[in-house]
């Protein structure tokens, strides 16, 4: 009987030691979590929001500027830890290509649905500057409404930075027979798009520009042009002719495959993060409308929305 008791006691001690060891192994690493920053406001503010959440949990954080397409290779190689705004339409292919090579994992999907498309400020439609909009065929009859000093008499279409979509929009306009009356110009940054939108609004002139939702413009009055419906394979890169619009899509999160092991608590929190259209629009508006710095915008958003983000940190709930 005494031997049995000793065996049970020894087993209990062993289990306790394993449990303690497991807890020690489960401690998040002191190695910094590397968060990338790109070139649009919500992404940068959210980087600092997420970094602030990680820091509140005791993690160390480092921010690095990164190319929005190449970042998935950086995650795969371990140079960057996460990506928190993986837009399906623009970055989905790069994301899945990196996953297929190994080293990148899908860390979940935000509540917000996305759309990345060309459009016009609402006053363009309200004032009937180009009758028939938002139907794309209206563009055939009013290129002069969108002409600028540098467009050679053609209508100008202001695309995002070329690194975002490459030749997607030029290919679309050619496939739809609009290229003879319109020229595609690439903006240097998201800020350049907002500056052009503000200038056009002040002057009351027509402007076609790339935009996306969720964004601060959701509440500011912006209408997306209704191009032919997107179908799988319609884009040139997928074997089609390019005569289609953009799909509505998801907004995902990506992480290096080692993140769950090196920072189990931070990864669990990251996997639970799910921001809404309203959340993301607020983050962008603090910079693009209220003119705050990205860092200050993140601090304000965190202070104003503790009820949102603290739930992400409650492990096991």
Where are these regions (language model features)?
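Short helix-initiation/N-cap motifs at beta->coil->alpha
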Residues: 40-41, 59-76, 184-196
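Pocket-flanking alpha-helical
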Residues: 47, 66-102, 196, 216-221
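Immediate post-signal peptide segment of exported/extracytoplasmic ligand-binding proteins
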Residues: 24-34, 54-55, 146-154, 308-317
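Ligand-binding pocket segment of bilobal, Venus flytrap-like solute-binding proteins
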Residues: 80-84, 158-236
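A conserved helix-loop-strand patch within extracytoplasmic ligand-binding domains
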Residues: 103-158
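C-terminal functional modules
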Residues: 267-317
């Amino acid at each position: 009987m005494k031997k049995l008791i000793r065996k049970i006691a020894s087993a209990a001690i062993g289990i306790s030691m394993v449990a303690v060891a497991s807890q020690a192994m489960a401690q998040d690493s002191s190695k910094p979590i590397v968060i990338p920053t790109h070139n649009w406001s919500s992404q940068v503010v959210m980087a600092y929001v997420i970094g602030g959440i990680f820091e509140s949990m005791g993690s160390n954080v480092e921010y690095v500027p990164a190319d929005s397409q190449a970042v998935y290779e950086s995650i795969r190689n371990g140079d960057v830890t996460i990506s928190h705004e993986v837009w399906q339409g623009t970055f989905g292919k790069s994301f899945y290509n990196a996953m297929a090579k190994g080293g990148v994992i899908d860390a979940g999907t935000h509540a917000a649905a996305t759309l990345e498309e060309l459009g016009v400020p609402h006053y363009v439609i309200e004032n009937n500057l180009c009758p028939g909009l938002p139907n794309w065929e209206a563009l055939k009859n009013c290129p002069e409404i969108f002409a600028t000093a540098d467009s050679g008499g053609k209508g100008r279409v202001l695309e995002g930075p070329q690194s975002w979509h490459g030749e997607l929009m030029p290919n679309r306009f050619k496939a739809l027979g609009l290229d003879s009356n319109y020229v595609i110009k690439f903006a240097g940054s998201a800020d350049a798009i907002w500056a052009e939108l503000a200038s056009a609004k002040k002057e009351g002139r027509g402007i076609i520009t790339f935009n996306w939702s969720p964004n601060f413009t959701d509440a500011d009055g912006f209408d997306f042009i209704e191009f032919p419906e997107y179908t799988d394979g319609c884009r040139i890169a997928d074997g089609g002719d390019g005569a289609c619009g953009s799909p509505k899509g998801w907004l995902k999160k990506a992480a290096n495959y080692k993140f769950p092991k090196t920072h189990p608590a931070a990864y669990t929190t990251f996997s639970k993060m799910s921001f809404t259209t309203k959340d993301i629009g607020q983050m962008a508006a603090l910079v693009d409308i209220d003119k705050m710095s990205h860092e200050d915008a993140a601090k304000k958003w965190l202070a104003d929305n503790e009820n949102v983000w603290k739930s992400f940190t409650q492990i096991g709930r």
